[in-house]
């Protein structure tokens, strides 16, 4: 069975680059009716935090990238790593090393001074050293000294590294903890991982890991090293370009559907298609069409996609996110129009859900403030008479008539005729009075969504405060 994994280290937030790797791994597993494993690589005890673990799990959950089976934690597998280390020592494929930090530092300085390749010189490799109680030691892997490590990378093609370039790396530290390059191999073997899709910053780790697979007589997985994501300026994507923490995108009003759609096309192509449902992503995804060159993050394109999903999604699919952002503003959504109806009206005018909540606040809050420029531009000496006439005409409407935007629009038009002024001389002051600004959806729709009671109350207030 095809089995992939996403194996983040909980030393910070869930980065968009990590999300893309997780997405590619998840899609490849789903495309092949396989399994997607989530593994938390928390062996760095000093830097790993529970807060970071929670951020990873929250991000994966928000995006809908559900793992199959349990979540694995490396810190819960230390006994297994020690067991395998002892097997390697017993088989003569690993050894105890007693070299002190001082000796290794002197060795490194000597190598640098003489333009030699830096790395461990193998002093303890064949010394048959057995540590005594109280002695400090590490365990090193006996890397092959001859030959070449080669693999056919699913993204980068054939890659070969001479074993002469690799030294005997430490697989168990002096404090007894196992090291990253060793743990991941044991994990991938035990979890039957068949395909490893990860960032190309791991390419240099791959030959070391392949040698451990072979030493353990295990099948070597297929590797697919995905290029990094660059900022718009071509530099590595970082905080200075904008949000890189995926949950910050939620706070900024982006939908998970938009994030996934954007990231799947960032370095992977399927003809000219830009919009993908999750089902379409799963059906179309393959490793062959991952681009070997880095991709630049385009924030404007992400915003365009987000707008598309706000406009085109079924309300049920985005309701949780819409309600989340309205809750953040403190607005009482029971004091206004149905959110489903509101989104249908406002979607064309916003790029994010933050904008949606902000630009719709006047529908739910009775405490509206007037935009000074809009008041100055649209409220004139004659506006009071217009408001009086509007109130008279609105009061005459029954509840059923108030549900028809066309009827309401006609009332505004009729009022303009009665006052012998143009439509704009009525519609724009009315907008300012009931929304606080000169911008809103179609006036008939705005009136309907606000409801008769709010409109009458706000017109009355505006008449008293703005038309003195």
UniProtKB/Swiss-Prot annotation:
Signal peptide: none annotated. It catalyses: tRNA(Glu) + L-glutamate + ATP = L-glutamyl-tRNA(Glu) + AMP + diphosphate. Binds 1 zinc ion per subunit. InterPro entries: aa-tRNA-synth_I_cd-bd, aa-tRNA-synth_I_codon-bd_sub2, aa-tRNA-synth_I_CS, aa_tRNA-synth_I_cd-bd_sf, Glu-tRNA-ligase_bac/mito, Glu/Gln-tRNA-synth, Glu/Gln-tRNA-synth_Ib_cat-dom, GluQ/Sye. One of its GO terms (molecular function) is glutamate-tRNA ligase activity. ATP binds at residue 239. It holds the Pfam family Anticodon_2. Zn(2+) binds at residues 97, 99, 124, 126. Monomer. This is Glutamate--tRNA ligase. It comes from Francisella tularensis subsp. tularensis (strain SCHU S4 / Schu 4). The lineage of its organism: Bacteria, Pseudomonadati, Pseudomonadota, Gammaproteobacteria, Thiotrichales.
């Amino acid at each position: 069975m095809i089995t992939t994994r996403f194996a983040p280290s909980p030393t910070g937030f869930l980065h968009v680059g990590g999300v893309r790797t997780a997405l590619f791994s998840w899609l490849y597993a789903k495309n092949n009716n396989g399994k997607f494993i989530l593994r938390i690589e928390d062996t760095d005890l000093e830097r790993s935090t529970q807060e970071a673990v929670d951020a990873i799990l929250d991000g994966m959950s928000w995006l809908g990238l559900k793992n199959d089976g349990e979540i694995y934690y490396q810190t819960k597998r230390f006994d297994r790593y020690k067991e395998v280390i002892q097997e390697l020592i017993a088989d003569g494929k690993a050894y105890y090393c007693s070299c002190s930090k001082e000796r290794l530092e002197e060795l490194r300085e000597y190598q640098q001074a003489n333009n030699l390749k830096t790395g461990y010189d193998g002093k303890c490799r064949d010394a048959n050293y057995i540590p005594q109680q109280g002695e400090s030691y590490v365990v090193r892997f006996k890397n092959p000294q001859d030959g070449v490590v080669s693999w056919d990378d699913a993204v980068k093609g054939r890659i070969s590294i001479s074993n002469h370039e690799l030294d005997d790396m430490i697989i168990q530290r002096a404090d007894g903890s196992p090291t990253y390059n060793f743990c991941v191999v044991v994990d991938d073997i035990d979890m039957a991982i068949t395909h490893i899709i990860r960032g190309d910053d791991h390419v240099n780790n791959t030959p070391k890991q392949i040698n451990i697979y072979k030493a353990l007589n295990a099948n070597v997985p297929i590797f697919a090293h995905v290029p990094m994501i660059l900022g718009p300026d071509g530099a590595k994507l970082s905080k200075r370009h904008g949000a890189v923490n995926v949950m910050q995108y939620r706070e900024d009003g982006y939908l998970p559907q938009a994030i996934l759609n954007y990231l799947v096309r960032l370095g992977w192509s399927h003809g000219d298609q830009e919009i993908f449902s999750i089902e379409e992503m799963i059906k179309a995804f393959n490793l062959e069409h991952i681009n070997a060159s880095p991709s630049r993050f385009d924030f404007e394109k992400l915003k365009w996609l987000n707008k598309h999903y706000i406009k085109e999604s079924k309300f049920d699919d985005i309701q949780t996110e819409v309600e989340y952002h309205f809750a953040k503003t403190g607005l009482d959504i029971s004091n206004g129009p149905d959110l489903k109806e509101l989104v249908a009206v406002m979607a064309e005018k916003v790029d994010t859900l933050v904008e949606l909540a902000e630009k719709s606040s006047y529908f739910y809050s009775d405490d509206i403030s007037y935009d000074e420029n809009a008041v100055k531009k649209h409220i004139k000496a004659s506006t009071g008479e217009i408001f009086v006439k509007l109130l008279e005409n609105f009061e005459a409407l029954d509840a059923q008539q108030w549900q028809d935007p066309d009827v309401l629009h006609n009332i505004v038009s009729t009022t303009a005729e009665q006052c012998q002024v143009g439509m704009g001389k009525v519609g724009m002051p009315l907008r300012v009075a009931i929304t606080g600004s000169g911008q809103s959806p179609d006036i008939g729709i705005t009136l309907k969504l606000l409801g008769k009671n709010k409109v009458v109350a706000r017109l009355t207030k505006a008449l008293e405060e703005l038309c003195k």
